[in-house]
């Protein structure tokens, strides 16, 4: 997702109209491939896992498939509908919770083997660092956070209380978007920004598109970090 829309994406209502664009991006994207590989190598069945801001279940579903018991926390009704649709045949072992991360008391979160959040903590009303602190305060055995680095607010502690970082990786990940037409790229820009582009902006959008096969592609990438902490007694 483009940096320009992170603040707009912090409201569940944003996703009511954005879900089709998210689905289209996911259909052609390999953004999560490395993330899934790492998280499924860390987790062990039958771990209890909480996925904060689960979206369409891109991380929850592989964990359920390997035998974990997953609570998918997703406050957007549109994204929950998508999650239920895509997890229709993989629901055993998954519980979908409509609450926001801010709405849950830490005392209700005891007993998790892993709490994970992928590009979701900065979308909370309390902000990235307080949301991360709340994960540690919930006392899971392990914490995994995936985040893009687009703001000075995104700061990653090596230690927090009795948690120590056990794994860290930062890499450039392709996040390109495929469109069926150049006009569709302009529509997507409008969905991102909440306004229609001017003539020069429209021309600039179209000038960045490259034709490959049946699609017009907008090249993009993101600096993505994956961090894992483990609790030590």
Show the residue positions of the predicted features:
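Conserved beta-strand signature within the Rossmann-like core of class I S-adenosyl-L-methionine
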Residues: 140-148
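A conserved beta-strand element that flanks and buttresses the S-adenosyl-L-methionine
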Residues: 116
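Short conserved loop adjoining the S-adenosyl-L-methionine
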Residues: 103-110
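Conserved Class I S-adenosyl-L-methionine
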Residues: 56, 171-233
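A short, conserved alpha-helix within the catalytic core of class I
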Residues: 123-135
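Class I SAM-dependent methyltransferase SAM/SAH-binding core
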Residues: 56-103
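Conserved class I S-adenosyl-L-methionine
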Residues: 1-43, 46-55
């Amino acid at each position: 997702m483009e940096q320009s829309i992170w603040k707009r994406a912090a409201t569940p209502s944003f996703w009511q109209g954005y879900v089709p664009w998210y689905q289209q991006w996911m259909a052609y994207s390999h953004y999560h491939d490395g993330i899934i590989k790492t998280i499924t190598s860390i987790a062990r069945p039958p771990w209890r896992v909480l996925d904060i801001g689960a979206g369409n279940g891109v991380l929850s579903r592989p964990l359920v498939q390997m035998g974990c018991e997953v609570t998918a926390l997703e406050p957007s009704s549109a994204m929950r509908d998508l999650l239920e649709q895509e997890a229709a045949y993989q629901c055993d072992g998954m519980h979908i919770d409509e609450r926001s991360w801010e709405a849950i008391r830490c005392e209700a979160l005891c007993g998790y083997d892993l709490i994970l959040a992928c590009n979701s903590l900065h979308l909370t009303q309390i902000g990235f660092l307080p949301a991360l602190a709340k994960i540690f305060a919930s006392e899971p055995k392990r914490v995994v956070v995936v985040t893009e680095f687009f703001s000075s607010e995104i700061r990653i502690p090596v230690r927090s209380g009795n948690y120590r970082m056990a794994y860290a990786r930062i890499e450039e990940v392709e996040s390109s978007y495929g469109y069926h037409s150049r006009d569709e790229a302009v529509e997507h820009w409008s969905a991102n920004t909440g306004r229609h582009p001017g003539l020069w902006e429209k021309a600039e959008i179209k000038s960045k598109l490259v034709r490959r096969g049946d699609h017009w592609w907008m090249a993009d990438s993101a600096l993505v970090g994956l961090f894992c902490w483990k609790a030590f007694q």
